[in-house]
Amino acid sequence: MHERARLHGQLTPILRRLAAGILAAWLAAAVADEPPASALGAQVMQTSTKRPRIGLVLGGGGAKGAAHIGIIKVLEEMRVPIDCIAGTSMGSIVGAAYATGLSAAELEKLMTGVNWLDTLASAPRQEIPLHRKSRDFLFPKGLEFGWKDGKLVAPGGLVPTHQIEDLFRRIVAGAAQVPDFDHLPIPFRAVATDLESGEMVVFDRGELAVAMRASMAVPAAFAPVEANGRLLVDGMLVRNLPVDVARNTCADVVIAVQVAAPAATREQLASFLGVAGQAMNIAVAANERAQVATLTDRDVRIRVVLEDVSSADFSKVPETIPIGEAAARAAAASLARYSLSAAAYAEWRADLDKLAAPPKLPIDEIRVTGLRATSPDVVRAQLESKPGDVYDPAKARADADRLVARGDYTAVSYGIASERAGVNVLAFNATEKPWGPEYVNFDLNLSTDFKGDTQWGIRLDYEKRWINSLGGEFRSSVQLGSPNAFAAQFYQPLDVAQRFFVAPVVYANQRLSYLYHGDDALGQYDTRRVGASLDVGAALAPWGEVRLGILREDVDAKPKTGDVLLPDPGRHALGALAARFAYDSVDKALFPTEGVRATASAYSFKPWLGSDRQYETVAFDGTATKTWQKNVWQLTLRGGSDLGSHAPFYDQFRAGGLFNFSGYRYEQLVGREFFLTSVLYRRRAVFLNETLGTAIYSGVSLEVGNVYRRLDGTSASGVLFGGALFLAVDSKVGPIYLAYGRSEGGHSALYLYLGSSIELYQR
């Protein structure tokens, strides 16, 4: 019990990260591959012949399936013993956990403590290599397509699965050394569907967490699971209520728990999503009815109806458990036939095989399997687990998370096995993305201040990874709109640990900018840049890197409209030495709740590098984010200077726009020096759709700073105060902001932002 309590104490904070959209499903079950009726577990074989053997059948139902915990609570109260369990989808998750020896109280604590929304997210962003993190800002929707044979390839599922499977692995950690499900404290079966043949697949052995993942792999929501040469999805499609599976496992008597929802109304069927959902419900109900028809008077059927909980409402899991309890109590008379005396029930509980804590085994070998495009040497260099160490599941889990965060795998499983006498192998099995290693991304962004200044862009990004054994990758991006831009980079690690790298870059952009004198827009000027750079750098960790480089650039700036007098128009050649540092530990790109993101840069433009001007610039931009309860606070510090070297107007610092001197128009303030300090507060106001992870935030920012030595010659001294009020939506189509900004001197603006406002390439 102490070991179990310790285990659950470790599990609880991680369990907060499971899946909000975990399914969008209605779970059913399958049609073939049934185990022989003789496949009885060792524990079942020892069951007293004085009573019938009881099989518990837990049907699918997504979030509604958490009601099974309430059923189990009543079974324990009434002292009804369970000799085997068969489950589908959510029923397999609850059933597997109970089969490993967890009590109903422990199950309730675990399931209600899970943060389902976070668990459906990708691996922790903090572990993503820094050179890949910029994609999160440019393409915030999180959708990624592959490119194979000249065609777009969509991912196998919309929801990442690594954290889900890893959660299951930790829930049933005690079963890691139990490959035969008959040897669990309560023999167990999980039902899945063979996606190719449509047959039912019954898991009676293997890795329990994989069986759970396969049983709840809702098509399209989650990628199929490849196991034993089969491509598997949710068991709901063929056997949502696996009564026959329980009978073939052990059951003389079946307690079948069916999770149901009220019939759909005409209004709910008005959309294509409603129609698709109802079509699935009809198919699931048909295979359920076939199983219900096999129940006899000796069996007990418990039907749990949840009026206001959908299959995807994981935030309502705590509400489902009392409903399950009520349904079980309504069947108390039928259940009472199988109730044991207090002494007999205590004896049954005591006789259950207890899962011993996994032994502390030394690691003799480390093996990585499942690799096709990626390099085993590079992968092994990322692992903290080493031969000679004592196996540490937490360290192995961190290794797996780190590998998945790199972006090449959908999931990485891990575990230790004794393949030969006295030889313990720590095996990592990586599932490479079937749609990789070439990727394509799209994005659309739009911003306006409703005063005629509108920025927009359509972005396309192509990336090819693992060009060579050290992990070289090529990436090119193009944007049409304002500005028009193109950038291409070849990122080449120099060692298997990928600590050092070289990165040649070519880029070009063209943009129209307003030239202001005070508050008056005099007209527009056109700036075109074409350049190339070569960086050498060191990756400090996933959170940071330093780069030293050299660049050459041609700039052509000329008036476009209005009465624009530029101080030095025309074409200019630039050449510079560059030093840059970047740090990024935020948990989310555009709506972070924790972490720090900062960049610092220094450029020295020299005639001997081909520059027709000599000057220097230094800049810093950093934001720290902290969450207290539901309140998110962000502190931002920005600043830059030309160190008195008189930088030309096209390389001076620009400010103005939302959260960047809110109240001023976009890039209204241009000068050779600036600083800005701001404090931003936001709070989630509404959860729009937990499955998609969308929410509405309200917030406020307070800003202080100024731009000095301005291009327009206006005087600037002291500091300017300002701020903004905003509503923001974190949606699958990207961030959406509606805001009102005001700054000292009566400057105000109304803003609408759709998508990412981050520029495609910034040197």
Predicted regions and their residues:
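Patatin-like phospholipase
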Residues: H2, A32-T88, A96-D401, A405-V412, ...
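Bacterial N-terminal signal peptides that target proteins for export
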Residues: H2-A19
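Hydrophobic helical h-region of N-terminal Sec-dependent signal peptides
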Residues: A19-V31
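Envelope-exposed proteins and targeting segments
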Residues: P52-I54, M78, L184-F188, L208, ...
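Solvent-exposed coil/turn segments that connect beta secondary-structure elements
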Residues: S103, T112, T193-E196, G206-L208, ...
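Gram-negative/organellar outer-membrane beta-barrel architecture
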Residues: A394, A411-A579, V586, F653-F659, ...
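C-terminal outer-membrane beta-barrel translocator/porin domains of Gram-negative envelope proteins
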Residues: V425-A427, Y439-D449, D563-G570, L574-I696, ...
